[in-house]
Amino acid sequence: ILAPMPRGILSTITAKLTQQLSTEAVHALYTEYFAKSHFVTVLPIGQMPKTAALTGSNNVQMQVAVDSHTARLVVSVAIDNLGKGAAAQAIQNANLMCGFDETMGLNFDGLGV
């Protein structure tokens, strides 16, 4: 679905769970996994990602939940496709491959629009 906005991608991904988990348990796992990530923020339970909050940045907002009726994991993610686009991804990957700090050349807060 195309939304009437000039930039940004809001994506929802679902996956079938192989064991029964609560939203709180999955949220804790994601929060722990991404705790040291420079660019990924796992939002508090119930707070949805907003593309406008990421305009011009290399950051990602993520929300996780469990749909207990269907036993599916639901992950919602927002990025600014012009901030965290192919060029920024290439810089981030090159930094990692060359042993540089992952954030080198990518530390910008965005446009604040």
Language-model segments: residues:
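C-terminal substrate-binding/catalytic lobe of Rossmann-fold NAD(P)-dependent oxidoreductases
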Residues: 1-75
